[in-house]
Design a protein with these regions (language model features):
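Active-site beta->alpha loop and helix N-cap motifs at the rims of alpha/beta catalytic domains
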Residues: 1-42
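Amphipathic, non-transmembrane alpha-helical secondary structure
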Residues: 11-18, 40, 44, 48, ...
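Acidic (Asp/Glu)-rich catalytic clusters
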Residues: 18-25, 47-48, 82-87
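Catalytic alpha/beta core domains of metabolic enzymes, predominantly
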Residues: 51-172
């Protein structure tokens, strides 16, 4: 995991992630990089270098789309460099319960939307995943050995004691 202090520093994030990757020297490791504004170009560069990335702290579908763009640009750059795409893995981790905690605080106690925004966001994000990892450009990258960047539903334990412990898991199966 990249140090949180570096969340707003692209170059330092890339340097630390590269150092971690080289020291660990394990092909099944993913380096956590936050989905901050500075994290987006870091994700692109790390994928270009062939470093597996778990994008963390995702809360919005719009930012998810930017994360996917960074991933795809990194793969495309790597392919242009004549480097292999096989074996590169990435996940985009949505922090579900944190979304509802933030939104619920702004809703009235009796709002029917309480505990629903994160699930709705995850469903929209999954549809975007299906859309973005299809079509001619994706088929070209896939033909070169690229894998999709998998959505990962993180923070699935509810923070509100009024919600079922399995709220997110059940709704997203």
């Amino acid at each position: 995991e990249c140090t949180p202090d570096l969340a707003d520093d692209t170059e330092a994030t890339v340097a630390q992630a590269t150092s971690l990757w080289q020291r660990l020297d394990l092909p099944n490791v993913m380096i956590k990089v936050p989905a901050t504004r500075a994290g987006l170009p870091a994700i692109e560069e790390l994928i270009r270098r062939g470093i597996n990335v778990n994008v963390t702290l995702l809360f919005a579908v719009d930012r998810y789309e930017e994360v996917v763009d960074s991933y795809l640009r990194g793969l495309s750059a790597r392919a242009r460099d004549g480097r292999p795409l096989e074996g590169i893995a990435s996940a985009a981790s949505f922090f579900l319960s944190r979304i509802d905690t933030k939104v619920d605080a702004r809703l009235g106690e009796n709002s029917p939307l309480r505990g629903q925004v994160a699930i709705a966001s995850a469903r929209v994000a999954y549809q975007r995943y299906l859309d973005r990892f299809s079509g001619q450009e994706w088929e070209r990258l896939s033909g070169l050995g690229a894998r999709t960047q998998r959505p990962l539903w993180a923070s699935t334990g509810t923070k509100n004691p009024a919600y079922s412990d399995l709220l997110y898991v059940v709704e997203l199966i």
